[in-house]
Regions:
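A solvent-exposed, charged loop/short amphipathic helix patch at secondary-structure junctions
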Residues: 231-251
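Transmembrane and membrane-interface helices of multi-pass
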Residues: 1-9
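Surface-exposed acidic, glycine-flexible loop patches that form ligand/cofactor-binding
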Residues: 23-24, 207-210, 261-268
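Active-site-proximal alpha/beta segments of enzymes that process anionic O-linked groups
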Residues: 28, 37-235
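Short extracytoplasmic/periplasmic juxtamembrane "stem" segments immediately C-terminal to an N-terminal membrane anchor
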Residues: 11-30
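Metal-dependent active-site segment of extracytoplasmic phospho-/sulfohydrolases and closely related
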Residues: 31, 52, 250-273
Length: 273
């Protein structure tokens, strides 16, 4: 192990908060709820197996033959937001800055008086100007909770590649392990795209309505993405017992919970989802 001087790092960074995630406008609301890696073919099969799903999504239009623009999340989300292909002309960060600052969607929303919230784990840029239009993304002070525990997480991350094969099973890391060691001083909880966080927050917080301007929310959740750690009710299970289908059913459970919460709040009829 090589010991070096502490890293020089800015103590302030852009921070995606949960601010107003469950606050809707009494006027108009526009919500895009992304359930990652949810294949339309799987949804079609689930509709045939579970007729009750048709009742849950009775007010929605389903295009069975839809195909994503990209096969990976990193490219797909920017395309959804901005509509422009990334063709390796310039850095990806420059491309993302253009998506955030020049998206026809965001431009139209601002012209129509919408308050814009972006609940997304990965921003792929730290340009404050490019992200200045998003109400829930703020500049916050960061602190390390424990340098020792953070170093352990980093060693496990490195070990997953370089450790002998028999030891790799002890080197599994999760993003949450790093998140726990980074404290943020801003007065808001940070957004987390994991399904169980969204489910817990929905159970703990009612959707409320206010009389502010119209609201737009882009909420990107893990959905059916690996690892397969959910049962159909979105409870965490042993990864050995998980399947893609169960993750997909868990995603439907989340969507149904969100729709139900919107209906209970009275915001459903004034929300395009």
């Amino acid at each position: 192990i090589v010991v070096t001087n502490p890293p020089e790092k800015e103590s302030t960074q852009l921070y995606v908060t949960q601010k107003d995630e469950f606050t809707m406008s009494q006027k108009e609301n526009f919500v895009i709820l992304v359930l990652d890696c949810f294949d339309s073919r799987e949804f079609t099969e689930l509709l045939s197996e579970h007729p009750e799903y048709r009742e849950t999504f009775a007010d929605f239009t389903y295009f069975e033959n839809m195909t994503a623009a990209y096969s990976c999340t990193k490219r797909s989300i920017p395309f959804i937001l901005g509509g422009d292909w990334y063709e390796n002309q310039g850095s990806f960060t420059e491309y993302m800055n253009g998506v955030y600052s020049g998206s026809p969607l965001f431009t139209a929303l601002k012209e129509r008086g919408y308050l814009i919230d972006l609940y997304e784990d990965e921003l792929y840029t730290w340009d404050e100007n490019a992200l200045s239009d998003f109400d829930n993304i703020i500049i916050a002070n960061y602190y390390v909770n424990s340098w020792i525990r953070l170093a352990k997480q980093e060693l496990k991350l490195v070990g997953f590649r370089y450790a002998p094969f028999d030891l790799k099973r002890f080197c599994v890391t999760k993003k949450s392990g790093f998140d726990e060691e980074i404290l943020v001083d801003c007065g808001y909880k940070g957004f987390n795209s994991e399904n169980y966080y969204f489910k817990g927050d929905l159970e703990d917080n009612e959707i409320v309505m206010d009389d502010t301007q119209k609201r737009f929310k882009f909420i990107h959740l893990v959905g059916a993405h690996t690892p397969f750690i959910y049962d159909s009710d979105c409870n965490i299970i042993d990864i050995k017992d998980g399947t893609y289908k169960q993750n997909a059913e868990a995603s439907i459970t989340l969507a149904a919970m969100y729709i139900d919460a919107l209906k209970k709040s009275g915001a459903y009829d004034d929300t395009a989802l």
